[in-house]
Structure formats: structure tokens, C-alpha cells
């Protein structure tokens, strides 16, 4: 069941992309950032990305990504109320989308951070402690004082059960 696992401990590498703030490569398949600006989506496509998962509640990427071949996905997350089910749905999108894929929110820190932490645990077999450490890494700008719920979600999730449920859902969807 772990045949699709990626490199276990590849660290996030900063990537300079025009009009894409807080951009990092987490693996050959996954990138993270803040909201891409004008021409940011074209620059991402030029970099070789195939898909974008937008985690913002009230902002759609369709206008700025127009005239690109990027596949756009959206999950409306509220940083103060992210649920286990929402993480599951995000990972199912990431696992089925053409890659590489970029995950972003407004700042690329809180919503993006929790989704990337779940990805690290489920897809790359990181420990929850290591994923939490990356979530809290000051490079990404996590707002711990506002969103302590995100660290609690990582700490309180039964990741073994989560992984089993994820694999079953993947199989059911033919991913």
C-alpha cells in the first residue's frame, strides 16, 4: 500500500516564481504558495505545473488563470474551522489531479500548511510530529496565535485510521 509513497524527508525548497509569493517545492509532485498574482499562473504553467488547488473561501482563480492550461480545483477552507473531512477531500483532489500541483490560500501559511502537513503524513509517511514542525516553520508564516486549532488537528487525528480511509476512498474513486 505504500508503493506510491514519495521521498520521506524531502524538505521544502523555496522557489522564485514571478507574482507567486511564499512559493516552495515540497516534492516533484507538490508545490505550495500564497495567492498567485497577475501573470503568476502563467509563470507556474511555464514552470511545468499542471494543476492548482485553491483553498480560499471567497476567491476564485478562474480569471487570473485564464489563458493557461492549468486545471483548477477549489476547496473552501476556513482556517479556524478546518475539519478532518476537508483534509481528506483535499488529499483526494491532490492525488487525482494532474501533477505537479500547487496548493495555495491567501498567504500560503495556515490553510495551505495544514493541507501540506496532511499530505506529508499520508502520502510521504512523515510522522505527525515532523509534519507539525514544518507547519510551524516560521518561513511559511503560520499564525499560531490565531489558528492553534490546526496544530490540534494534527495532534488529535488518528493518522493510521485516516490513511486506511484515504486508501479505501482512492480505490473507490479509481485513483
What positions do the PLM features span?
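Short cysteine clusters
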Residues: 105
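Conserved lysine of the Walker
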Residues: 111
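Cys-dependent protein tyrosine phosphatase-like superfamily
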Residues: 1-101, 114-175
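Substrate/cofactor-recognition hotspot
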Residues: 108
